[in-house]
Amino acid sequence: MSTLGAFSMWDLFRGEVESQMKLFTEGLLALEAGEPPAAHLASAMRAAHSIKGAARIVQLDVGVRLAHVMEDCLVGAQEAGLILTGAGIDVLLAAGDLLSRLS
């Protein structure tokens, strides 16, 4: 049996959420610190997108919906000029914390 075979899908989901949440959080904290947004928005959006896909695989519908809303907020900031304030970033970070707890 391969090492990967010893893990359940939930174990893999948990690991994916953990690694992607690091990228998501780093991106949002960089935005909050006033760093140029383009790369950080893209990184955080990709992380939310990856979590959405992982949640879909384990059929965690609430996780899919939450990650989708997070992704939409970041795409809005990228493409439509939505400005993420400190309060908005805090909400996204709280949503990320919730996804971590769901995993």
Where on the chain are the PLM-derived regions?
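N-terminal assembly/transducer modules of large multi-domain enzymes
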Residues: M1-S103
